[in-house]
Amino acid sequence: MQKTNKFLKIGNKEFKSRLLVGTGKYSSLEVMQKSLINTKCEIVTVAVRRVQGLEHGHKGLMESIDWKRIWMLPNTAGCSNAEEAIRIARLGRELAKLAGQETNNFVKLEVIPDKKYLLPDPIGTLKAAEQLVKEGFTVLPYINSDPLIAKQLEEIGCATVMPLGSPIGSAQGIRNAANIAMIIAESRIPIIIDAGIGVPSEAAQALEMGADGVLINSAIALAENPILMAQAFSKATEAGRDGYLSGRLKENPLASPSSPLDGVISNN
């Protein structure tokens, strides 16, 4: 993507904030509400299956968020194959309409058959993405940090790709920076790092690398003080983006004095 300070553009929508936030795992809806405010986010993910099933922590979720201010990103969490993900994506679009977002065709596509490490299925993701793009969805697929899959998803019309930093909820940070750097370098669509980020400095690292945004859930929701951590991630995301735009000092194997040596008083 071009090195610019314009808004984050996904599909035909523009957003000031580059921090996307999940809505799961909070101790209460009140903590979630206050945390979302502190993140200054404009996009939140909602697990369609969990909201519909009124699972613990999701009852009352739809009524707890100001959908006039925040854009809903329905996700297909819990889907293990392409067919299931396509069906849930369609339900997600209806959920967004119920929230008053009639033109919202966004979907965070997750196809995860692996229950231990929660790694996405590249073949199922590609299959589901292709169909959803045909149906007019703005598709944001969650993927492994595989440059080839990222490029294929871009070519079929996905609005962004969301490579994982490390497994979901693991707080291991960005373990595959080289692959993610390749994806960023070769992409013409926004890259949003999703999963594995545990602390604000890792969010800053992602933005400094040139990623267009980050999606955070567990690192905020499960922090000792989620509301304060939300604020920290907001600041880190802004700092990381500014650092990227500023152009970092290049690494050098040799030292370089901060003060010039010309004119230094000698002992002679």
UniProtKB/Swiss-Prot annotation:
Catalytic activity entry: [ThiS sulfur-carrier protein]-C-terminal-Gly-aminoethanethioate + 2-iminoacetate + 1-deoxy-D-xylulose 5-phosphate = [ThiS sulfur-carrier protein]-C-terminal Gly-Gly + 2-[(2R,5Z)-2-carboxy-4-methylthiazol-5(2H)-ylidene]ethyl phosphate + 2 H2O + H(+)
Broad class of the protein's primary localization: cytoplasm
Record pathway: Cofactor biosynthesis; thiamine diphosphate biosynthesis
Subcellular location: Cytoplasm
Pfam families: ThiG (PF05690)
Enzyme class at the top of the EC tree: transferase
Active site as annotated: K108 (schiff-base intermediate with dxp)
A single MF term (Gene Ontology): thiazole synthase activity
Known EC number: 2.8.1.10
Gene Ontology CC, one term: cytoplasm
Keyword set, alphabetical order: Cytoplasm, Schiff base, Thiamine biosynthesis, Transferase
Oligomer and partners: Homotetramer. Forms heterodimers with either ThiH or ThiS.
HAMAP family reported for this sequence: ThiG (MF_00443)
Role this protein plays: Catalyzes the rearrangement of 1-deoxy-D-xylulose 5-phosphate (DXP) to produce the thiazole phosphate moiety of thiamine. Sulfur is provided by the thiocarboxylate moiety of the carrier protein ThiS. In vitro, sulfur can be provided by H(2)S.
Family note: Belongs to the ThiG family.
Protein name (database record): Thiazole synthase
